A protein has these predicted regions:
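Extracellular/virion structural assembly segments
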Residues: 1-190
Length: 190
């Protein structure tokens, strides 16, 4: 099971960032640093909510507290930076774990660089960002590397889901008994 956050309220600041797996090998003799890219990198997002009315605040606060108590994952629908036009429902993709390329099949309009999408494999959502689109071969270059091998899997551009756990303390602020903010970080777990 998973717990899905409500619609992101206006004024919310979401700061996505890549959690890298691998590392940098720094030469002890002054040579160039080598970047080791490994399968397993994933996204996290810092979420900072604005001042909310009590009902909305209670809904947002209940989600991470419920997930913490049950051990369920949280789902945050990532807002698209580019929304016009979104690729249609029914776009499917196939790729190989460890690759950063995904072949897609479906009608126009095509995905664009900078668009978030997610797909589900084995009951888990995997979030990716489109880096480049080859319209001739219908290949997407994505970040991070694919952690699983999707096969004719539905790509969700309308509601891209970051699924994971809160990786920070669950805390909120009250000022004169008014909910004035809530900050947390959610990190993909699959």
């Amino acid at each position: 099971m998973s717990v899905t956050f409500p619609v992101v309220p206006r004024g919310t600041v979401i700061t996505p960032h890549l959690v890298r797996v691998g590392g940098d090998l720094v030469s002890v003799l002054g040579g160039p640093t080598q970047r080791i890219t490994r399968i397993g990198s994933r996204y996290a997002a810092d979420v900072e909510l604005p001042t909310l009315d009590p009902t909305c605040a209670a809904e947002w606060l209940a989600c991470p507290l419920t997930a913490e108590g049950t051990g369920d994952t949280l789902i945050l629908v990532m807002p698209q930076m580019l929304t016009d036009p979104l690729p249609p429902a029914g776009l499917t993709g196939t790729g190989t774990a460890g690759s950063n390329q995904l072949t897609y099949v479906g009608p126009a309009p095509r995905p664009k660089p900078g668009m978030w999408f997610s797909f589900m494999v084995g009951g888990r959502n995997y979030l990716h960002l489109v880096l480049a689109v080859n319209a001739t071969t219908n290949v997407l270059t994505v970040s991070p590397l694919l952690r699983v091998s999707p096969s004719a899997t539905l790509l969700d551009f309308a509601n891209p889901k970051l699924e994971g756990f809160c990786s920070t303390d669950i805390a909120w602020s009250l000022e004169w008994f008014r909910f004035v903010g809530h900050k947390f970080t959610i990190t993909e777990n699959a």
